[in-house]
Amino acid sequence: MVPVVALVGRPNVGKSTLFNRLTRTRDALVADFPGLTRDRKYGRAEVEGREFICIDTGGIDGTEDGVETRMAEQSLLAIEEADVVLFMVDARAGLMPADEAIAKHLRSREKPTFLVANKTDGLDPDQAVVDFYSLGLGEIYPIAASHGRGVLSLLEHVLLPWMDDVAPQEEVDEDAEYWAQFEAEQNGEEAPEDDFDPQSLPIKLAIVGRPNVGKSTLTNRILGEERVVVYDMPGTTRDSIYIPMERDEREYVLIDTAGVRKRGKITDAVEKFSVIKTLQAIEDANVVLLVIDAREGISDQDLSLLGFILNSGRSLVIVVNKWDGLSQEVKEQVKETLDFRLGFIDFARVHFISALHGSGVGNLFESVREAYDSSTRRVSTAMLTRIMTMAVEDHQPPLVRGRRVKLKYAHAGGYNPPIVVIHGNQVKDLPDSYKRYLMNYFRKSLEVMGTPIRIQFKEGENPYANKRNTLTPTQMRKRKRLMKHIKKSK
């Protein structure tokens, strides 16, 4: 499970600065839902291979209304959602009554809490944090969020319990590996395969969307049709529910972010949107069903969720619910709007359904299987290199400083999502337009549907880089003769 880190503290202690520094590693603000999240912002970040979700909360400015009340509005919710809390204080301003009130509340919660003293740049950290030891939260971590000083050390301590989940990276001679695979494939031999068989694993399917778009209705419709649910496996109170099921002799794990409930027990309170549940479900899924309300159309919240799905590299099927009862004219308008606003994700299948009446629900699983198979398909190095060569022949890379960018070979760099690694010279100077061209060319050539393709570029190393030129004895004698000739001519 992806860990969740919440930033809490008074206003202007640097929470947003730290949030921006952390999420900038992925260059994405995941979601900002006014009115739903109480000014909380959610971001996705990565440190040394460990991904986590970061929550930036609004500041708590005083105790006049009671810390409990102010916390309940935004920060308390963030604390409850989080696995770890970073309590930030201002080292320049010193200890404030609001800091003491927040610390008192945090001590009453059974959450790992790290006391972070920000704005220590230009100060003696040891002296600046002395007063904050009275808060009773243990070790203090001095940082300067604006400059990044101390942030990495802090995160190493914060994420330590989850670092065991990160697989160590092995050093691989990719050039040697490529030529070995290429030679084997040219000789008609099968390239060595790893032990991973995607068809032997159940497909993890997450159903996500805004409140009241019909997620629970769709979940109950799917489960009601199949009637093969063995048992529910709830995690903690904030975890999604994982439901094993089977359809057409294929195993699935349905990740329900709202919980499976009887129709009579579904209330507005129970249907409340949980951002964290949704983000974690997306991270844990193989395929995501994004449910959209046909009557309301595409909203900014839908696009925020869509952005997170794409950034996560998950396979995607778009489900337009509540299609029944709409006039033909309205249906055409909805389709035109979808084509306009979702034109940039032409790789995803779009289904128009009625979860309430069941129309179109059965067709979803064909697209789910297609998307999963596309995302886990193994493609040989030789095939990827041939596709790259054809793409270059059809459209040459641009000139960079008078020299044409040279693409050498391509190989698979990962799956779910599919990653194609292209090696070449000056690839860092390729314009984004050509990178998009290559991505679309690979997608069409491989007939990938339902999943994004990622292209990574690696610069070929110059074997003479950082090496001093050494003249041969013949070259040295020639150099001496030339130098004598130059001196005589003077």
Curated annotation (Swiss-Prot):
**Gene Ontology MF term list:** GTP binding; ribosome binding
- Residue ranges of domain EngA-type G in the record: 3-166, 203-376
Q: Which SUPFAM superfamilies match?
A: P-loop containing nucleoside triphosphate hydrolases (SSF52540)
**Per UniProt, which keywords does this protein have?**
GTP-binding, Nucleotide-binding, Repeat, Ribosome biogenesis
Provide the residue positions that the database annotates as binding GTP 2.
209-216, 256-260, 321-324
What is one GO biological process annotated to this record? ribosome biogenesis
Q: Which residues form the KH-like domain?
A: 377-461
Q: Which residues bind GTP 1?
A: 9-16, 56-60, 118-121
Pfam families noted in UniProt: KH_dom-like, MMR_HSR1
Q: Which InterPro entries match?
A: G_ENGA (IPR031166), GTP-bd (IPR006073), GTPase_Der (IPR016484), KH_dom-like (IPR032859), KH_dom-like_a/b (IPR015946), P-loop_NTPase (IPR027417), Small_GTP-bd (IPR005225)
Chain segments annotated as transmembrane: none
Superkingdom, natural source: Bacteria
State whether it acts alone or in a complex, and with which partners, per the record. Associates with the 50S ribosomal subunit.
PANTHER family assigned to the protein according to its UniProt record, in alphabetical order: GTPASE DER
Which family is it part of? Belongs to the TRAFAC class TrmE-Era-EngA-EngB-Septin-like GTPase superfamily. EngA (Der) GTPase family.
Annotated function: GTPase that plays an essential role in the late steps of ribosome biogenesis.
Q: What is this protein called?
A: GTPase Der
Gene designation: der
